[in-house]
Amino acid sequence: MRLLWKLVILLPLINSSAGDGLLSRPIFTQEPHDVIFPLDLSKSEVILNCAANGYPSPHYRWKQNGTDIDFTMSYHYRLDGGSLAINSPHTDQDIGMYQCLATNLLGTILSRKAKLQFAYIEDFETKTRSTVSVREGQGVVLLCGPPPHFGDLSYAWTFNDNPLYVQEDNRRFVSQETGNLYIAKVEPSDVGNYTCFITNKEAQRSVQGPPTPLVQRTDGVMGEYEPKIEVRFPETIQAAKDSSVKLECFALGNPVPDISWRRLDGSPLPGKVKYSKSQAILEIPNFQQEDEGFYECIASNLRGRNLAKGQLIFYAPPEWEQKIQNTHLSIYDNLLWECKASGKPNPWYTWLKNGERLNPEERIQIENGTLIITMLNVSDSGVYQCAAENKYQIIYANAELRVLASAPDFSKSPVKKKSFVQVGGDIVIGCKPNAFPRAAISWKRGTETLRQSKRIFLLEDGSLKIYNITRSDAGSYTCIATNQFGTAKNTGSLIVKERTVITVPPSKMDVTVGESIVLPCQVSHDPSIEVVFVWFFNGDVIDLKKGVAHFERIGGESVGDLMIRNIQLHHSGKYLCTVQTTLESLSAVADIIVRGPPGPPEDVQVEDISSTTSQLSWRAGPDNNSPIQIFTIQTRTPFSVGWQAVATVPEILNGKTYNATVVGLSPWVEYEFRVVAGNSIGIGEPSEPSELLRTKASVPVVAPVNIHGGGGSRSELVITWESIPEELQNGEGFGYIIMFRPVGSTTWSKEKVSSVESSRFVYRNESIIPLSPFEVKVGVYNNEGEGSLSTVTIVYSGEDEPQLAPRGTSLQSFSASEMEVSWNAIAWNRNTGRVLGYEVLYWTDDSKESMIGKIRVSGNVTTKNITGLKANTIYFASVRAYNTAGTGPSSPPVNVTTKKSPPSQPPANIAWKLTNSKLCLNWEHVKTMENESEVLGYKILYRQNRQSKTHILETNNTSAELLVPFEEDYLIEIRTVSDGGDGSSSEEIRIPKMSSLSSRGIQFLEPSTHFLSIVIVIFHCFAIQPLI
């Protein structure tokens, strides 16, 4: 009997465990929703969706109004997967509440309930409607009277034969609750036939009623009267959470009433409310608890007002706050599940197991959302649902309860085969077999049963913990697990290793930026254990691959030293060497302090600024681990090249000084300031520049220099100077003061020049005698006052142009392109005008005025060569004197004809003979053209190949003899000499040095690109030597 009881308990467990990794309860992925189906489409099919996941795959059932649907009895229903398909649905048979059930081996779950309804609208009755008679100014209601229907309707009205709907405004309103047309005040244009038009979107159908005639009575006009509210919203409206609530209110009256809204509790209407149709409709979207309360509509005109009010009551379907979760428990354990939902009104709870209602009994306690099952057995396994329900909706939370019963089993969680530990360490050997109910645990070392002692503890979860390990603790350890269904054993080995010790830890270091250091980290360890070194900097692992520019691990198997190259300020901090083995992790830490030049000072402020000084303050930046010893202030202006150090008070700014006065500034100049700090390591980066500020204006102190002048016209005194640069003008309104007086006079004349860029002043007075000496000084001024004056300089007044023309002018032609002009010097005095030099003018018969040549010579020069002339051309020339005032009268013109052009043909058929150091040359006589000058002789030009100096030999013959030392090659050319100048040269002839000369006969050169035929013949004794 006991064996049979065990089998009953174990059989479900075996089946469940066989696929424990795969089995899963049904979980809905699709649930049915309410459907309103068009009645006119009854010959088609309606689908109620349902789908669920689970393993094995769930199968499905459906309930209609709580009764199972029999799919085998009728073609009317069929399953499409888990969804219910109803063929040709019928309003009498199929209307109602539907629910889907999904089932597999683990249990059954119920879906939400879905309502199936049928939308329709019948036709209006065809009988004629009665005529409605009203006076002008009276209000009227035209009834729509919708036919039988189901589903939401929308209403509109047409007028006479107009296809467009009646437009609604503050005088006309169509209620979407009743369908009636309300006209607040009838006008003559309202007379006609009105037709109600109804659309049922869910039924996909529209119907049109019979026309209602509206006529105007002839017994007078309706007088004014107070509003009469015809469209009212209900006194109580149930409004769902998150829904959109619409309240209608419309009144008849003369004049046409205005509509307004308010809350009776005095609170303002929510900002989200929307008004439409001249405020006849108030819409509250996304309705919430705070929106409920009493609302009032006020219709008013000049004759009075009327009110309509109603209460909006908030309700909310249930929503889960706490759901139940899948739970696996051992046999005989207790289950406690709690679910909780919100809603208004508060929901009540029911519990289901595998789709059936669960009722309280001896082991089962149900109280609101709490389910307690004591002393679980395998039959309690299944899928449970907590249902939360109020009068508006029911919702379900699903979970699986799996009750397990089995003997101890180590197959999924065996004792670790090998456990390693170091001498002196602690170890926990786990023992966690699968056993339901939980197994009792005991341990053996070898064959010895272990009992708890000072070093050996049996933990609550069955694990074995041993403290302060010694070598003798090594061996095999067996865990024995027992419950009422059986016993199981599992064994593992404990291996004891020597401890790892850091023998050389890193130590604190103090270094300077740019140095390289080594942080030691060396260990002793069990030879069989692999050691891994990991370095941390300020808590972060140092990536030695990415940090290759600075960090490098050096050393062997037991050495993990860290080298830091070119150390920087940001390398200051804590360095942690971690030694990791499979058994333990050791670490040692050291602080590295990196010292460097200070960081940039901060918050540089200009406290005050005058014309030449500025008060500065600043805060010290980081000292980078070395105290700041000195500060330096630098300035920059638009006129300076970069930043310049400036003088300060105090003169030396030590590391504790944070304000100073900058002196020696220029007035009215824009300055930027910055501060630089220094310490024993070096000078740091400068601070950010201060704001750009201008010093105050001041009287200028720098006087102009390089005072000169003179020249100009008669009766003028011209004074020049070097202008003062902007940075020395010291303020706005800058200009120059010009002071002058004749030499010997005691009275100064004073003039002002307001242009800051001026460097010249001309004073004109007819009484000024030419070339009179004046004492001159130039000063400066600005809006602040007059500044310094220069030293006195003598400047002469302007002079007259020369009054006399040169005499004895003559012309002589030297060549085809050159002539010489000569004249007699003028003896001048103050009355005839000073002569500084002479100007030669020359031209041809056909020269235009713009083509007249001009050449000046200074001093007492009385001849001038003019070159670049045309050959065989008549040239005219005249000469005139000049001075600073201008030029005087010209001499009478003279003329001369330039020589004919020199010969254009170069000497030809040049032959040469070299004997020792004597070179004999001969050539043909050059015949000239008719327009060329006759040949008067020849020039031989010769030079050594590697020298630039050329020697010239002139001859009247067509041959020449040269005595030259031929230690180098010589280059020779020959040209004609004539009255017109030198003619064209022959091509260069290369005469080799004696040591390289050999007899080679005669060589003829091809004609040149200038069509010059040259034949070079080399004679040596009686043989002919060819050209090299």
Curated annotation (Swiss-Prot):
The modification Phosphotyrosine is found at residue 882. Expressed in nervous system. Highly expressed in cerebellum. Expressed at intermediate level in thalamus, subthalamic nucleus. Weakly expressed in corpus callosum, caudate nucleus and spinal cord. Changing residue 954 to V: In a patient with amyotrophic lateral sclerosis. InterPro entries: FN3_dom, FN3_sf, Ig-like_dom, Ig-like_dom_sf, Ig-like_fold, Ig_I-set, Ig_sub, Ig_sub2. Residues 1-19 form the signal peptide. One of its GO terms (molecular function) is cell-cell adhesion mediator activity. It is a lipid-anchor; GPI-anchor. Keywords: Cell adhesion, Cell membrane, Disulfide bond, Glycoprotein, GPI-anchor, Immunoglobulin domain, Lipoprotein, Membrane, Notch signaling pathway, Phosphoprotein, Repeat, Signal. Changing residue 585 to C: In a breast cancer sample; somatic mutation. GO terms for cellular component: axon; parallel fiber to Purkinje cell synapse; plasma membrane; presynaptic membrane; side of membrane; synapse. Residues 600-698, 703-800, 805-901, 902-996 form the Fibronectin type-III domain. It comes from the Eukaryota. Belongs to the immunoglobulin superfamily. Contactin family. Interacts with PTPRG. This is Contactin-6. It comes from Homo sapiens. The gene is CNTN6.
